[in-house]
From Swiss-Prot:
Source organism (scientific name): Yersinia pseudotuberculosis serotype O:3 (strain YPIII)
Family: Belongs to the RNase HII family.
NCBIfam families: PRK00015.1-1, PRK00015.1-3, PRK00015.1-4
UniProt main location, coarse: cytoplasm
Keywords per UniProt: Cytoplasm, Endonuclease, Hydrolase, Manganese, Metal-binding, Nuclease
Protein name, as recorded: Ribonuclease HII
Cofactor: Mn(2+); Mg(2+)
Amino acid sequence: MSETFIYPQANLIAGVDEVGRGPLVGAVVTAAVILDPNRPIVGLADSKKLSEKRRLSLYDEITEKALSWSLGRAEPEEIDQLNILHAAMLAMQRAVSGLHIVPDYVLIDGNRCPKLQMPSLAVVKGDSRVAEISAASILAKVTRDREMTELDLLFPEYGFAQHKGYPTAFHLEKLAALGATVHHRRSFGPVKRVLGLV
């Protein structure tokens, strides 16, 4: 972990992260994780810096060893209604409230915290500085990637399994040629343009 993080004085600390702010399609997915100090997990890092194979292996280890973990999400309709930032905050709240053990402190990746029932702190680059946030980033990323692979089976022509819904040249080309699916975020510029909403 880079730039040593000084932990707050707390017994049960949850880490929270989100995946999927940038894609044009699908939910924004969040995870909250309380790690077990007696069952350390080696190799936790920002999910974006790990190979897919390593992420999958760590996913299994985290879900098995964590004291508690939970996923949250906000669907495309909620993203369009609220905007992506507020939808991500809502999904984080859902992840924290889904924990079966109530944390006494929550550390969140980024520079902004959602409203929670307990003290919280936003940690810039938290996914590479805080083990709990790294674990949350891995759970959220693996979950969302799996959803994109499933969506790819329904809409193979869009290539969701490859680009995970991000606005790559290929995705934009297919969006222009084929139009938007019901899973596309209508409030996002490229989708708006295709639907003639701009």
